[in-house]
């Protein structure tokens, strides 16, 4: 299940998961048309995403899908280039060992061109990315590859949300919290890693945990997804400076 997949500890070196699997998935680059959602001008532009297809991808089967967002200074290709393609190897090994079912992973980017010098300057782009995903990237990806979306209009995306996840590291986690805040109708599963919820301002999850928790809870109560209609798996290493914000949020 998605819950088991997201909550399972990821141990890279144990059992040789950092090695190439015999059955290797493939990485596909996708350029797509979108708009400037961050600056409000609506100017047309092109963005890029990379897509992991599991070994033996079959057009006759349906696949769960996850959108995984990089951190600051990253790009759409970072996850599949870092550590000599470690993420692809890990996914291949986890599928081969039966830890997760074969699935599709999409790595988008909130950057256009060079990353911002200061990571807080990326905030408006992180906030805008979930809308770009729903309006532009999900329709392109999930009409080309066989997910559980029967259609890729707003209704079709919502109906298939229980088969769609979003996650990210650092500023990608900030993006994930924005997705929970603003596009809950498109995703059921959320995996923010080492990043704060900034819906009420920079570092609000750490500095204003009561207000942030209440804000997120109200968002859910006002939606159609209260109770079991969503799942959040948030994590941060204990030596990571971001861990303090998760400690505060978890307490609420």
Predicted regions located by residue number:
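Non-catalytic cap/lid and distal C-terminal segments of serine-dependent acyl enzymes
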Residues: 1-250
């Amino acid at each position: 299940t998605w819950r088991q997949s997201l909550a399972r500890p990821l141990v890279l070196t144990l059992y040789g998961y950092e090695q190439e699997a015999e059955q290797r998935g493939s990485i596909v680059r996708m350029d797509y048309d979108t708009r400037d959602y961050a600056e409000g001008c609506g100017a047309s532009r092109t963005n890029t995403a990379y897509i992991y297809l599991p070994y033996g991808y079959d057009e006759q089967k349906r696949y769960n899908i996850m959108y995984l967002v990089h951190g600051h200074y990253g790009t759409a290709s970072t996850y599949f280039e870092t550590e000599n393609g470690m993420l692809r190897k890990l996914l291949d090994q986890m599928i081969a060992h039966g830890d997760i079912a074969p699935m599709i992973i999409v790595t988008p980017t909130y950057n256009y061109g060079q990353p911002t010098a200061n990571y807080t300057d990326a905030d408006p782009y992180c906030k805008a990315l979930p809308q770009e995903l729903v309006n532009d990237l999900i329709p392109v990806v999930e009409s080309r590859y066989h997910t559980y979306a029967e259609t890729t209009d707003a209704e079709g995306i919502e109906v298939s949300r229980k088969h769609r996840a979003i996650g990210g590291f650092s500023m990608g986690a900030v993006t994930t919290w924005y997705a929970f805040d603003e596009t809950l109708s498109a995703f059921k599963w959320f995996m923010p890693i080492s990043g704060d919820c900034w819906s009420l301002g920079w570092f609000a999850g750490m500095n204003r945990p009561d207000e942030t928790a209440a804000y997120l809870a109200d968002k859910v109560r006002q939606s159609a997804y209260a109770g079991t209609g969503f799942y959040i798996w948030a994590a941060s290493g204990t030596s990571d400076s971001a861990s303090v914000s998760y400690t505060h949020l978890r307490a609420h």
